[in-house]
A protein has these predicted regions:
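Residues in the recognition helix of alpha-helical DNA-binding motifs
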Residues: 25, 36, 64
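Short basic helix-loop element that most often maps to the first helix and adjoining turn
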Residues: 6-25
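Short, basic-rich loop-to-helix N-cap that marks the start of a DNA-contacting helix
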Residues: 39-52
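Recognition helix of helix-turn-helix/homeodomain-like DNA-binding domains
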Residues: 28-42
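Residues in the helix-turn-helix
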Residues: 21, 32, 46, 60
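Short, charged recognition helix plus adjacent turn
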Residues: 2, 10-11, 62-72
């Protein structure tokens, strides 16, 4: 399974928030923020904190992509 957080980064741009600011607001460790930047899977409670912080749903910040799309 592969995921992408491009939707999350777009929300941050639209709201003029940095990735670092999101990490601080949502209480996310720098290591986990690195996983997000690398489009790696993170624990559901982390995604829940992001959703609560930004007042969005899971589908607004993450999308599932087929492995063929990632490798292309």
């Amino acid at each position: 399974m592969a995921v992408q957080y491009n939707k999350l980064w777009k929300i941050l741009i639209d709201r003029k928030l940095s990735k670092g600011e999101l990490g601080k607001l949502a209480g996310i460790s720098p290591n986990t923020m690195t996983k997000l930047r690398r489009d790696e899977i993170v624990a559901l409670p982390i995604l829940d904190r992001i959703c609560e912080t930004l007042d969005v749903d899971y589908g607004d910040i993450i999308e599932h992509v087929k492995k063929e799309q990632v490798q292309a």
